[in-house]
């Protein structure tokens, strides 16, 4: 196990994986990576990084904001010519341009940026064959949540519209250094290539923000639909009149979005 020489920064959402056997297990969830171009966000002390590099990958690009870790990774670059290390905030770079097929992402994501990074990547997530990512368990449960459950949210809908999602492993806080206050989960995200159901993604995103904006409101009240419009929606989409957005499946929400767009319904910004 590596020796910690630097204190983890809470502001960077750092919780390091230092046990090589644990890191190897996480990498294994990505399946075969030989010949792949891998992206790792938040490599930390490089425990998982070196395991990836020993797996005969075509290339590995690691992006790390903490400049204190650069010397360690520069040493790895000298050892592995197919390794590229960027010292930068991943939220401030154009990650899409750095993806080379065939590509997978394997990462113990900094918890403070995991959701916003994933939401941004949804625009080009089809460029990855697979993503094996570490999240806080609460976030992982949102990714795989079913309609009518407490964890079901906009994030659930968007990710499941674009990908197959599987929570493959829960990890206790003791697997990390320093131990986080919550449990963590490894999630496999496999992009579909196309939307699971036909829908205008940009329009649906606007609709979801309104529909999920007030969880206690029915779809009609959340969207501010006139009676006549709502009655037509009920007939077309076959949903109960008192239904809330969090009780509708991804397919049903797509149907609602398509119906409203066909009626050229515009959502108020208030």
Swiss-Prot record:
EC number(s) per entry: 2.1.1.182
Binding site for S-adenosyl-L-methionine: 15, 17, 42, 64, 89, 108
PROSITE patterns reported in the protein's UniProt record: RRNA_A_DIMETH, SAM_RNA_A_N6_MT
SUPFAM superfamilies (alphabetical): S-adenosyl-L-methionine-dependent methyltransferases
An MF annotation (GO) of this entry: RNA binding
Family matches, as SMART domains: rADc
Subcellular locations according to the entry: Cytoplasm
Alphabetized InterPro entries for the sequence: KsgA/Erm, rRNA_Ade_diMease-like_C, rRNA_Ade_Mease_Trfase_CS, rRNA_Ade_methylase_Trfase_N, rRNA_adenine_dimethylase, SAM-dependent_MTases_sf
Family in the record: Belongs to the class I-like SAM-binding methyltransferase superfamily. rRNA adenine N(6)-methyltransferase family. RsmA subfamily.
Name by which UniProt lists this protein: Ribosomal RNA small subunit methyltransferase A
GO CC, one annotated term: cytosol
Functional description taken from the UniProt entry: Specifically dimethylates two adjacent adenosines (A1518 and A1519) in the loop of a conserved hairpin near the 3'-end of 16S rRNA in the 30S particle. May play a critical role in biogenesis of 30S subunits.
Catalytic activity: adenosine(1518)/adenosine(1519) in 16S rRNA + 4 S-adenosyl-L-methionine = N(6)-dimethyladenosine(1518)/N(6)-dimethyladenosine(1519) in 16S rRNA + 4 S-adenosyl-L-homocysteine + 4 H(+)
Keyword field: Cytoplasm, Methyltransferase, RNA-binding, rRNA processing, S-adenosyl-L-methionine, Transferase
């Amino acid at each position: 196990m590596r020796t910690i020489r630097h204190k983890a920064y809470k502001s960077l959402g750092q919780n390091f994986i230092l046990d090589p056997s644990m890191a190897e297990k996480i990498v294994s969830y990505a399946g075969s990576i030989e010949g792949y171009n891998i992206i790792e966000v938040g490599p930390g002390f490089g425990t998982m990084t070196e395991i990836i590099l020993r797996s005969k990958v075509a290339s590995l690009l690691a992006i790390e904001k903490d400049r204190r870790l650069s010397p360690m990774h520069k040493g790895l670059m000298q050892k592995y010519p197919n390794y590229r290390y960027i010292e930068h905030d991943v939220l401030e770079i154009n990650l899409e341009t750095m993806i080379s097929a065939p590509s997978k992402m394997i990462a113990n994501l900094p918890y403070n940026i995991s959701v916003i990074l994933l939401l941004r990547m949804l625009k080009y997530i089809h460029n990855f064959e697979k993503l094996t990512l570490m999240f806080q368990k609460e976030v992982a449960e949102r990714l795989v949540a079913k309609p009518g459950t407490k964890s079901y949210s906009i994030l659930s809908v968007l990710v499941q519209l674009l990908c197959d999602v599987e929570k493959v492993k829960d990890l206790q806080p003791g697997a990390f250094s320093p131990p986080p206050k919550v449990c963590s989960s490894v999630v496999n995200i496999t992009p579909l290539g196309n939307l699971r159901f036909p829908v205008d993604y940009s329009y649906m995103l606007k609709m979801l923000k309104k529909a999920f904006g007030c969880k206690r409101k029915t779809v009609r009240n959340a969207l501010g639909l006139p009676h006549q419009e709502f009655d037509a929606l009920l007939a077309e989409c076959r949903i109960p009149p008192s239904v809330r957005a969090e009780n509708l499946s991804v397919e049903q929400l797509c149907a609602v979005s398509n119906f409203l767009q066909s009626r050229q319904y515009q959502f108020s910004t208030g």
